[in-house]
Regions:
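Short acidic, S/G/P-rich loop/turn micro-motifs used as interaction or catalytic elements
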Residues: 60-62, 106-110, 139-140, 205, ...
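Sec-dependent N-terminal signal peptides
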Residues: 4-14
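Metallo-beta-lactamase
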Residues: 97-108, 279-283
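Long, structured stretches of catalytic cores involved in phosphate-ester chemistry, encompassing
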Residues: 258, 263-358
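Residue-level marker for buried hydrophobic side chains located in beta-strands
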Residues: 32-33, 53-55, 101, 244-246, ...
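Flexible, acidic/histidine-containing loops and adjacent segments that form or flank the divalent-metal
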Residues: 20-31, 37, 83-86, 92-99, ...
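Short, solvent-exposed loop/turn elements at domain surfaces
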Residues: 41-45, 53-55, 61-66, 205-210, ...
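Pre-active-site segment of Zn-dependent metallo-hydrolases
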Residues: 25, 50-100, 115-122, 253-272
Length: 391
């Protein structure tokens, strides 16, 4: 009996020591963390010199789903802040983030009226930001104040929060289309071959020349009829040979939509984006996004889906991910399993285990590795890791 107990204790000890954790970020690494809360999108970026940026902080307030990851003991915003502090530990001020970028004004990216103080507002209880960037500062009037306030019932709260931060020293800015300097390395900018390129926002895109922009909607169309998604901020991050695309909920158009609503902004920006290594699926992989022409032009090796409801992604979009419209591999990652039943096991089998999705680009930007961290644990153990890919 004693021998059996000793063997069991030894096995338990071996199991505990076998757990693996993501090695700490270090100078020269570029990390992208797609944070899994079950309630919206949030991406934490640690740049090679220690500059940090949080993109979005969603919380739908159980409007679409009752999923809470890792559990409901904290709000999604509180879990986002907890996650950021955990992985920013190697930095001098883990609670201070250099940039916050809000891609657009929807609850699954900023917070919901159903839970006052949710999303971004909960994040502010723990984290501070040196710069806040969104698509509409300071007037918040495009395409009209009425349409913006209609898109989000927490706009008053959001504007007050940003202005409150500005009064305490935070810098607020409108996303500058065409800029390669608005978001940049702040500590050792000359040491690394790194660039963030602002491509589109507010239905306008960079022309590729200077800071000139052009509208993406036709003159005959009433821009006020668009939903908020098409105004999303879209940008690329380049480090050496590695390139990452993130475009909020930017939309394309199905064949049936093109005649009714000219919302195919994906096709227009695709040539500016060009081939990428990793992309976050636009609009959570919903049916109106990540169309074949966009995929063919970007040709990502890795597609990451951040989900907040059933239909993230839709089956038709997941099939587009898998369709060989371009040569080479395409690895699929996802932050939750809410769409598993609708997708079916055949499609689901193409996704890596779900959870916090981490892209780690190694020093110089010529190699990277994918990790998935346990969305139910408080210490973020690794549940999947890829080989190291060389570019």
């Amino acid at each position: 009996m004693k021998q059996t107990i000793v063997i069991l204790l030894s096995l338990l000890s071996l199991s505990a020591t076998a757990q693996e954790y993501l090695p700490q970020w270090q100078k020269g690494y570029l990390d992208f963390h797609s944070i899994a809360t079950g309630q919206g999108e949030s991406t934490f970026i640690m740049m090679p010199d220690g500059t940090t940026m949080l993109v979005d902080a969603g919380d739908v307030g159980e409007l679409w789903t009752k999923v809470h990851l890792p559990d409901s003991s904290k709000t999604p915003g509180e879990w986002i802040a907890h996650y950021v502090k955990h992985f920013a530990a190697p930095l001098d001020e883990p609670s201070n983030v250099d940039y916050f970028l809000l891609t657009h004004f929807h609850s699954d990216h900023m917070g919901s009226h159903r839970k006052p103080g949710s999303g971004y507002f909960d994040v502010l209880k723990t984290l501070s930001f040196d710069r806040v960037i969104d698509r509409a500062w300071p007037d918040y009037d495009f395409p009209s104040k009425e349409s913006i306030w209609k898109s989000s019932k927490v706009m008053d709260q959001y504007v007050d929060a940003v202005r409150g931060q500005v009064s305490e020293g935070t810098v607020a800015e409108q996303f500058k289309i065409g800029s390669r300097k608005q978001i940049s390395l702040l500590y050792e900018p000359k040491k690394y071959d790194f660039e963030v390129y602002n491509i589109a926002a507010n239905g306008r895109m960079h022309t590729g020349k200077g800071m000139k922009t052009k509208q993406m909607w036709p003159d005959w169309f009433d821009v006020k009829k668009y939903d908020e998604n098409v105004f999303s901020c879209a940008f690329t991050v380049r480090y050496g040979k590695f390139r990452y695309f993130l475009g909020g909920d930017l939309s394309g158009a199905t064949d049936s939509q093109k005649d009714k609503s000219p919302r195919d902004f994906e096709t227009q920006i695709a040539p500016l984006v060009g081939p990428v290594t990793v992309m976050k699926a636009n609009h959570h992989g919903y049916k109106d996004s990540t169309m074949p022409v966009f995929l063919w032009t970007l040709r990502p090796d890795v597609i990451v889906v951040q989900c907040a409801e059933d239909g993230h992604p839709k089956t038709v979009t997941a099939n587009r991910f898998l369709d060989p419209v371009y040569p080479g591999r395409r690895d699929l990652y996802i932050t939750g399993d809410i769409s598993r039943v609708d997708l079916g096991e055949e499609i689901w089998s193409h996704f890596r285990p779900y959870g916090h999705v981490v892209v780690r680009v190694y020093e110089g930007g010529s190699s990277y590795q994918m990790f998935v961290l346990d969305p139910y644990s408080y210490d973020y153990r690794i549940i999947y890791k890829s080989e190291i890919y060389h570019l």
